[in-house]
Amino acid sequence: MAARTKNGLTASASGMQSLLPHTLPHADPAGPRDSLYPAFFTGIDEAGRGCLAGPVVAAAVILPPAGAPAAPHIAAALSGLTDSKKLSEKRRLTLEPAIKSCAVRWGVGVVWPQVIDRINILQATYRAMSLAVRHLRGGGAAASMPAGLPPVFLAVDGDKTIPGQVLQAVTGLSVPQEAIVGGDGCVMAISAASVLAKTFRDRLMTALDKRYSGYGFATHKGYGTAAHIEAIRRLGPCRMHRLSFAKVKPAAAPHAADQNTLW
């Protein structure tokens, strides 16, 4: 059974708390803080939480520890890695294969609009993050991690950790966690996760643009731009729109009679 610690972390009764460092970092724009976490910790971030259309996508990344023999190579290969929002699309696409090659494990979780509307975006984000952990697979540096070792610690971007009951239900794991505000800019594994989540989701939205033409998904990726909202007013919502979102409802209202036949 999980227990709350004085740091506000969720730790299992099996002694996982012993893996935690004595002092956990807060957001620090000076640079990555990965060395303050247990070896083989998992960095987690999401993309698309605030969008009006498309799924919310999360990624999880485990990088080799700072003292690993491959560390100098990783530092060079991932030079300039930071919050995906601060990187150009070209740079993100260059970093994506490098991250997968340098990672011990990486995974992606996707939750679609119908589920978002049913359980709300926050719960959907928790589920996407949990799915990313469940889908962790071997990366290019898989051999550096002991075989069969489960995730030992989750560093989650933002101000909230994944509720223990959600993580347990999706992954079967009870793992200590910490939420780090601005973690995508100061923890390399979270930065890597932010890039994988963003590139994966952008690719999905570009593909969806071909199926649901007229909305401009390939351009705005589902965010609430003026052009996107105008397209919803003109065409009505499609199956990729989040009907529970406040900005979608007014634009979709004139098409309410067509809601049962979303294309």
UniProtKB/Swiss-Prot annotation:
What does the record say about how the cofactor binds?
Answer: Manganese or magnesium. Binds 1 divalent metal ion per monomer in the absence of substrate. May bind a second metal ion after substrate binding.
EC number from the UniProt entry: 3.1.26.4
Write out the entry's keywords from A to Z.
Cytoplasm, Endonuclease, Hydrolase, Manganese, Metal-binding, Nuclease
Primary location recorded for the protein, binned into one broad class: cytoplasm
Give the record's GO CC terms. cytoplasm; ribonuclease H2 complex
- GO terms under biological process: DNA replication, removal of RNA primer; mismatch repair
Q: What sort of enzyme, by top EC class, is this?
A: hydrolase
Per its record, what are the GO molecular function terms? manganese ion binding; RNA binding; RNA-DNA hybrid ribonuclease activity
Which residues are involved in binding a divalent metal cation?
45-46, 157
User: Which cofactor is essential here?
Assistant: Mn(2+); Mg(2+)
Q: Catalytic activity annotated for this protein? A: Endonucleolytic cleavage to 5'-phosphomonoester
All copies of the RNase H type-2 domain together span 39-257
Q: Which InterPro entries match?
A: RNase_HII, RNase_HII/HIII, RNase_HII/HIII_dom, RNaseH-like_sf, RNaseH_sf
Q: Where in the cell is it found?
A: Cytoplasm
* Family the entry assigns: Belongs to the RNase HII family.
Say what the protein does: Endonuclease that specifically degrades the RNA of RNA-DNA hybrids.
Which HAMAP family did the record assign? RNase_HII_B
Q: What is this protein called?
A: Ribonuclease HII
* Originating species: Oleidesulfovibrio alaskensis (strain ATCC BAA-1058 / DSM 17464 / G20) (Desulfovibrio alaskensis)
Recorded name of the encoding gene: rnhB
